[in-house]
Design a protein with these regions (language model features):
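N-terminal active-site beta-alpha-beta segment that forms phosphate/nucleotide-binding
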Residues: 1-108
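Conserved phosphate- and dinucleotide-binding cores of soluble alpha/beta proteins
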Residues: 76-173
Length: 173
């Protein structure tokens, strides 16, 4: 199956899924040692078909952790900005809520990245939406521990990969 065929398959599966409760996934994330032991965490603002993260954003921020979110700045590039609260989010590219403020450039301080995807396999391979934003960013910071996060129906036997695709260190579903 090609990447495009798998994306289409996942879109069809999504339509057949009941509204899923993400609480168990979020609990596993909150309890993961890489999250509890980290000070600086890259997260994401969820699209409707992704595991919701707003509660996790608020919780981690309340714990005094630095939470970073991506902001798309061109067709090929994203940068990170610090999450400071819901009031400082604005709708950005692709309808994704993005933080305002100054770019965060201290990539060496990032302990863990929580990454969404359309599909993942048990080897940590990720199928994104086809734009390559995360793969390009993560290729520059290979030392960051990467956690893929998805609903159980997004976990598949095999994700087709290309040389530039970045593998997750673990997947939580």
């Amino acid at each position: 199956m090609t990447k495009q065929e798998l994306r289409q398959f996942i879109r069809q599966q999504k339509q057949q899924q009941p509204a899923l409760d993400a609480n168990a996934i979020l609990l596993r994330l909150k309890q993961h040692p890489r999250i509890t032991d980290s000070q600086t965490i890259l997260l994401y603002c969820a699209l409707p078909d992704e595991v919701p993260t707003l509660e996790l954003l608020e919780r981690l921020t309340a714990q005094g952790k630095t939470v970073l979110l991506p902001r798309v700045i061109s067709d090929k590039e994203m940068e990170l900005r610090r999450y400071t609260g819901r009031a400082d989010l604005t709708e950005g590219a692709f309808g994704i809520m993005e933080p305002v403020g100054e770019p965060f450039l201290d990539y060496d301080s990032i302990d863990v990245a929580i990454i969404p995807g359309m599909a993942f396999d048990h080897e940590g391979h990720r199928l994104g939406r086809g734009k390559g934003y995360y793969d390009r960013f993560l290729s520059n910071v290979p030392y960051i521990y990467k956690i893929g996060v998805c609903f159980p129906w997004q976990l598949v036997d095999e994700v087709p990969t290309d040389e530039h695709d970045i593998r997750m260190d673990c997947v939580i579903s």
